[in-house]
A protein has these predicted regions:
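Sec-dependent bacterial lipoprotein signal peptides
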Residues: 1-16
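Structured, soluble extracytoplasmic/luminal domains of envelope-associated proteins
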Residues: 79-101
Length: 201
């Protein structure tokens, strides 16, 4: 019986050392985009509904994605969006359009009010481009479709692709998120300008 004690002690020590092993802390991030142009009230005559942003299948998970070579990508399990990225971008898009004052009101897609327009969108790309170690960049590309839903047959009224390639200070997750925020702000600002021009034409 005594011969089993040393083996048991060794196993116990190994088990305890495994329990004490430290793992990297997971970090969670979100977007924080503010429309700097203040509008007194919604000035338009039409309602618009905002569909949830569709996301390229490659970015359905919450992990950050890094491009490390011409055809090489890796995901970062320890740095993530705190919600699915489509939900986060949808929230920023809704807030931005609500503050733009282009339309009479901006509505969620499940609202029962009949809206003239529906805004569909797709997040095509979102990743950190670290393929050049000396020139890290934040990539964010989106596509938008403005659908006229005022008649029995919906028609595409406007569409455009917006691509952003932002130089960032380092390959850290914090710097990457700052770059994505800048990229998303640039896209929403240009989208607002284009939709305002279209609405006033």
């Amino acid at each position: 019986m005594n011969k089993l004690i040393p083996i048991f002690l060794v196993l116990l020590i190994i088990g305890c050392s495994g329990l004490n092993k430290e793992y990297p802390t997971k970090n969670y991030y979100t977007f924080d985009v503010i429309n700097d142009i203040k509008v007194n009230s919604n000035q338009g005559k039409n309602y618009i509904k905002i569909e949830r942003v569709d996301v390229n299948h490659a970015y359905h998970h919450r992990d950050f994605n890094y491009r490390t070579g011409p055809d090489e990508f890796i995901s970062d399990y320890y740095n993530q969006f705190y919600k699915p990225v489509g939900a986060l971008v949808t929230s920023e898009l809704y807030k931005w359009m609500s503050s733009a004052g282009i339309y009479k009101d901006v509505l969620p897609v499940n609202n029962l009010i009949n809206a003239k327009y529906i805004l569909d969108s797709k997040l095509v790309d979102i990743y950190g481009d670290f393929s050049n170690p000396d020139d890290p960049r934040a990539i964010l590309n989106m596509q938008f479709f403005l659908v006229d839903d005022s008649s029995d047959v919906a028609e595409l009224a406007y569409s455009n692709v917006y691509n952003q390639n932002i130089a960032i200070s380092s390959k850290t997750p914090g710097a990457l998120v700052e770059g994505w925020n800048e990229a998303l702000k640039n896209i929403l600002k240009q989208l607002e300008s284009d939709l305002r021009t279209f609405e006033n034409s």
